[in-house]
Amino acid sequence: MHTDDRSWITLRQDADTGIETIRAHFEGHAFDPHWHDSYLIGFTEQGVQQFSCRGALHKSTPGQIFLVEPGEIHDGDAPVDGGFTYSMLYLEPAWLARELRTLDDTPLACGEPGFDRTLTERPQLLSAIANAFHALEQCDLRIVRQTALDTLLLNLSGHLRWRQERQDDPRLPRVAIRAREYLHAHFDQDIGLDELAAVTGVSRFRLSRAFKAAFGLAPHAYLIQLRLARARYLLARGQAPAEVASILGFADQSHLGRWFRRAYGLTPAHYRTRCSNLPDD
């Protein structure tokens, strides 16, 4: 969680597409490991942006593009003085897949889009991302926003691979997969390790080791990320932070706020206000 007063973040959500635009500056530690349900497409404007993703440590510098798929765990730090500034688009998976399929007369293969690389340097793609970002952030004319997004999609299509919808890696321990399924089905409940161990038929210690090795997070951290992803969804649709905290099993609004800020760098109330255009509670 960032605490430096020099850090800041601005956010806007496009009413037509649901795309979020985020521009932020962080000094020191930016955010804890987390994931998003969206595709993240952005670029570093200034400084060095260091983050872990796909089991590797990446350092993005000005002009570099970063591409993160839904569900990919990543964090963020500023390893040098002066911090880093970035601009980013959050693209909903259903919107991206649907729009990509309209690019050609011939339908694309079934499946979902993915990125071959987390970091890349493509001047034409960088320009397309920046133009789409500014058109959405400035709430430009609808025809301007749509043209900028079409240009982005055309440039992005050359850097995507289409794959079958994700299947579990057969090498993953069955106990880890079963525990993950249980967490997804009961993420709003007060789940204990004993309960997960009983469901999977192994000890708490074996389960915790297998789960973290498989998914990169301990069971409790994974559960929190599930709740935070749902919290973003509910807040963006106007539900009050206190209500969201209660629905998702957080102890109270401040408990939700602490975890939300550690993952995303802003408060639930700020996120709700920027996405829903409702007054801050």
Please place each PLM-identified region on the residue numbering.
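N-terminal regulatory/effector-sensing and dimerization cores
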Residues: 2-109
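Sigma70-family region 2
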Residues: 75-79, 159-160, 212
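Basic/polar phosphate-binding segments, predominantly the helix-turn-helix DNA-binding elements
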Residues: 155, 178, 184, 190-226, ...
